[in-house]
């Protein structure tokens, strides 16, 4: 290695020279990347202005309440429709028109009603009976029965027929049900359309599907919501258990790092082994059972995931996946056993550092709070922007009309030329839009909103990384630990980051935000091109998405190490990124093995916590723990709380381990700098711990003499 060093250094910069005044993070530093700091402040001012404009023009009621043909809200308090929460379609069959997909509005009159119709009636029959008072509530407001039947139906004052309906998403849909495989409304398989002819119930089904294309998705969402309402208490208990396990693991790492790492490795192997055994037992148990040999391909997608657990092929797939993971982990442990010892020494050192800076374990809460603020501002601004359009009215006509889909004014339409040429046409509320400059810029404002979210979120993450790196670097470069540590290393690092390096953090976050917004645009274009048959375009899009994904991962890695250099030396972003990159390239073998081995060990720790809590949740929610068998709530889909607990447990474990991860990365870079700066002599002693020196066969001469 020593023979290669001069040539290797020439390609990737020169090693750090010994500096007798260097004692860790530099305190006398200046502001860096001031221009980027100014740009960030201006962008935040612009972002606030966009939010104010959106909140001024936006109206979230458009998302919550349905609107009638006049653009008035149904069920909103303080309006004339306060007691009319449901939207009623005069002729829902019209919703099957392709115009719905273009205008997002059914070409039929719509009014707000107190309740959906519960009986079958035609206007022709109800007009001359006592049912007319009931029927009239489904006519346009202010309707007076002083017209002929044909004129009333032609003007769209009343629906031709009422069909028993049920409310769904505040809209009235036909109460269609199946009896012995036959679709029916009430006791009928056909209905009279009010014009003297009878139509099939399937016409209503098509109209209802187009009027609410997410019917099945909403039903699935409602079942999932029901599961959450009865299981949220147990989900929280599961997450608390995950938090307690993570905290206990971190505390044990502080005192028993080496033992805990080996216990963690063995436990992961045992957990995977038990998973393989359980899958095999289930696979064997299903042998010979009726329907268990159906293939996953033949079964297709099912919303009830319990169906898959009755198939042998499902458990075979699980067993193969777990076996592959088990073999990979065992092989990695065999070939990397020597490097694992050094990685354990780094983790031990990180445990000591975290022990001296215990408040660092609470810093993820600060990052979480700031990220929640970013998400809340972005989401609220997006909602207000999307609802800041004005009511647009368009011409609808069942018969051919040259003015169909043209904009109109409902107040002047009755006396307009369009009304005279198309007597059956109606000027009806179509959607929310607008023709002003602000409305034309809405798409751009939404993109700006998303871009600022990425920029600010990455800035918050960068601030956390620089803060933790500064605190842990103070620990490493303290020759006499903990005597040479500053009083409040975390708060000092946080203050330095905000005071001197806001611009550098903004620069790194900006680069990452640009790549991320490009990835979002590529995803949007990919969705638009899915229907296209151009194979070249699809291939190009896939390549671009892959390249930008790799670029984002590389930039995140480079930024992380650049922030460590910023925390230590106080240099600007570009200089820090270059120095960090060259330092890592000069020690590429150690980076590829040591740093990644520690990441792998932390991943095993997360898997141990997530796997343990996930298995416990699985046995609890599937009523397999006899002691609490009657306590577990009945569920539509038991995978809902299980997946929630698993994902939540991973996020909690990741939050705790991220502090350790940043500590290890910081100590690793400091360790590499230490090897380049110092040689172990009395004048240039190593700052690394005695354990690391022993593993690397390094000694401080002064210590050896004593």
Curated annotation (Swiss-Prot):
InterPro entries on file: Choline_transptr-like (IPR007603)
Keywords: Antiport, Cell membrane, Glycoprotein, Membrane, Mitochondrion, Mitochondrion outer membrane, Phosphoprotein, Transmembrane, Transmembrane helix, Transport
A single Gene Ontology CC term: specific granule membrane
Transmembrane region(s): 34-54, 233-253, 257-277, 316-336, 365-385, 458-480, 505-525, 564-584, 600-620, 639-659
Sugar-modified residues: 187, 200, 417
Reported pH dependence: Optimum pH is 8.5.
Cellular compartments annotated: Cell membrane; Mitochondrion outer membrane
UniProt entry tagged with the keyword Transport: yes
Quaternary context: Interacts with COCH.
Protein name: Choline transporter-like protein 2
Upper taxonomic lineage: Eukaryota, Metazoa, Chordata, Craniata, Vertebrata
């Amino acid at each position: 290695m020593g023979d290669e060093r001069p040539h290797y250094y020439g390609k990737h910069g020169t090693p750090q020279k010994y500096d007798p005044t260097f004692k860790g993070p530099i305190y006398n530093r200046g502001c860096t990347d001031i221009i980027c700091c100014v740009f960030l402040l201006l962008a935040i001012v612009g972002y606030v202005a966009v939010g104010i404009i959106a909140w001024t023009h936006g109206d979230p009621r458009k998302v919550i309440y349905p609107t009638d043909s006049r653009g008035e809200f149904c069920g909103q308090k303080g309006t004339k429709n306060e007691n009319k929460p449901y939207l009623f379609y005069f002729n829902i069959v019209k919703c099957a028109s392709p115009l719905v997909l273009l205008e997002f509005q059914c070409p039929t009159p719509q009014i707000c009603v107190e309740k959906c119709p519960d009986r079958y009636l035609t206007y022709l029959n109800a007009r001359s009976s006592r049912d007319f008072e009931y029927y009239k509530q489904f006519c346009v407001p202010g309707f007076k029965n002083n017209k002929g039947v044909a004129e009333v139906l032609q003007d769209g004052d009343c629906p031709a027929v009422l069909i028993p309906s049920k409310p769904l998403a505040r809209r009235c849909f036909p109460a269609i049900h199946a009896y012995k495989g036959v679709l029916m409304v009430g006791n009928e398989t056909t209905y009279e359309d009010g014009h003297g002819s009878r139509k099939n119930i399937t016409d209503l089904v098509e109209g209802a599907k187009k009027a609410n294309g997410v019917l099945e998705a909403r039903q699935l969402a409602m079942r999932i919501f029901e599961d959450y309402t009865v299981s949220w208490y147990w989900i929280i208990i599961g997450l608390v258990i995950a938090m307690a396990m993570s905290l206990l693991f971190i505390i044990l790492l502080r005192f028993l790092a080496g033992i805990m790492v080996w216990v963690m490795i063995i436990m992961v192997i045992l957990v995977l082994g038990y998973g393989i055994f359980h899958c095999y037992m289930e696979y064997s148990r299903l042998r010979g059972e009726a329907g268990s040999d159906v293939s996953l391909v033949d079964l297709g997608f099912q919303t009830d995931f319990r169906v898959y657990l009755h198939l042998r092929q499902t458990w075979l797939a699980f067993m193969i996946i777990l076996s592959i993971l088990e073999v990979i982990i065992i092989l990695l442990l065999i070939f990397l056993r020597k490097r694992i010892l050094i990685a354990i020494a780094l983790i031990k050192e990180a445990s000591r550092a975290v022990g001296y800076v215990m408040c660092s374990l609470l810093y993820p809460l600060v990052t979480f709070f700031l990220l929640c603020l970013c998400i809340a501002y972005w989401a609220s601004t997006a909602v207000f922007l999307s609802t800041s359009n004005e009511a647009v009215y368009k011409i609808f006509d069942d018969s051919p009309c040259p003015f169909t889909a043209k904009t109109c004014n409902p107040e002047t339409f009755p006396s307009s030329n369009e009304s005279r040429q198309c007597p059956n046409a109606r000027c009806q509320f179509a959607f929310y839009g607008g023709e002003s400059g602000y409305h034309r810029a809405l798409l751009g404002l939404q993109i700006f909103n998303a871009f600022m979210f990425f920029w600010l979120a990455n800035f918050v993450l960068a601030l956390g990384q620089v803060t933790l790196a500064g605190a842990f670097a103070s620990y490493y470069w303290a020759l006499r630990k903990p005597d040479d540590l500053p009083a409040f290393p975390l708060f000092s690092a946080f203050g330095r980051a905000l005071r001197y390096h806001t611009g550098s953090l903004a620069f790194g976050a900006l680069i990452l935000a640009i790549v991320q917004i490009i990835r979002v645009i590529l995803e949007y274009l990919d969705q638009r091109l899915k229907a296209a048959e151009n194979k070249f375009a699809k291939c190009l899009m896939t390549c671009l998405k892959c390249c930008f994904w790799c670029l984002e991962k590389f930039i995140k890695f480079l930024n992380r190490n650049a922030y460590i250099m910023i925390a230590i030396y106080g240099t600007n972003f570009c200089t820090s990124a270059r120095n960090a990159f060259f330092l890592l390239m000069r020690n590429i073998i150690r980076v590829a093995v040591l740093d990644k081995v520690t990441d792998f060990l932390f991943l095993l720790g997360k898997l141990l916590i997530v796997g343990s809590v996930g298995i416990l949740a699985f046995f609890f929610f599937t009523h397999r723990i006899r002691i609490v068998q009657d306590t577990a709530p009945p569920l539509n889909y038991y995978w809902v709380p299980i997946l929630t607990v698993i994902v939540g447990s991973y996020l909690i474990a990741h939050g705790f381990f991220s502090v350790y991860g940043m500590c290890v990365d910081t100590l690793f870079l400091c360790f590499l700098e230490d090897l380049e700066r110092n040689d172990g002599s009395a004048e240039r002693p190593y700052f690394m711990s005695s354990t690391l020196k022993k593993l690397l066969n390094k000694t401080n001469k002064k210590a050896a003499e004593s």
